[in-house]
């Protein structure tokens, strides 16, 4: 994973030679959106020629063949890359570049299948669309002319985006992306376990995840006041508990598994206390997880994350003032301990401190980057 990040950084540095960062939106570790509009005149090149030059430089610098999509809006650029460049277009120089405007999109891709090749249409949406006779984007566009209300009944507010995309429209601009600021910030860690874990072993892994996330909160001077836990069971659970006849779902391979255990617990106030967050997380785990099942994935979300110094410090007088004062002293003591851990980690590296239980869990969180082995 660290090699992947190194190459991603090298490629991004090439973009910066041509474009201002304000005109680049990093979509993922290996995809970006770039607003070419001001640069076509600046470089006196067509959009496709400018992109060719950049792809050649990427190839020369990294020996990686990159793909690109050019479109009259963000959606069409994405589709031009995902469907045309990656699956159809390789030019005489060996470069993969796709181009779409609204009319080309309708001529070339309205009949394209499967429909879940299109951005933001997953298997679930594809199944719902098929149930009303829609198999491609052309079907969806024509259906929307007389049955818009039906689409809103099925997909809610997301119907607007589906209809726009069926016609090749996209209202979101690069400027809107750059100006967007989320009202609520969350921190999420999801771990796919290397093999099916027992209840106890998965519970121990949750402790490791909480420890890692709380340390991150303290490092960034952040607090949270809500915990969301999602636990996905393994398919072998059905073999282990053959009498189970409760709710079912599918894993990423389409195999039947017991429905995920999912719930939320609110904290009394914003904190970054390892003890409190861990205890509440385990309380939630014990409450919602079936102890007889095997577990394959754990996702933990810390919600309503804010800076520690933005929290109102002065509280109303309380009958439990002595208890609260004692709790506050414990928090301060614990925070000092976690900051001492951070100081050691910063000086000697992530692997310099670990708990003995970490050796048993088979998932080395400190050796990973973004959930992948470094």
PLM regions with names:
Residues 127-294, 310:
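DNA-contacting surface of Y-family translesion DNA polymerases
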Residues 254-374:
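Acidic, metal-coordinating catalytic segment for phosphate/diphosphate chemistry
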Residues 1-174, 319-374:
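Gly/Gly-Pro- and Ser/Thr-rich, intrinsically disordered tail segments characteristic of DNA damage-repair
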Residues 27-31, 71-74, 222-226, 293-297:
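Short Gly/Ser/Thr- and Asp/Glu-enriched loop/turn motifs at secondary-structure junctions
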Residues 72, 233-235, 304:
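Glycine-rich beta-alpha junction loops
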Residues 41, 75, 236-238, 307-309:
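Short, acidic Gly/Pro/Ser/Thr-rich loop/turn segments
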Residues 65-67, 228, 297-299:
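Residues at or immediately flanking beta-strands
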Residues 37-39, 232, 268, 303:
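Solvent-exposed residues in well-ordered beta-strands and their adjoining turns
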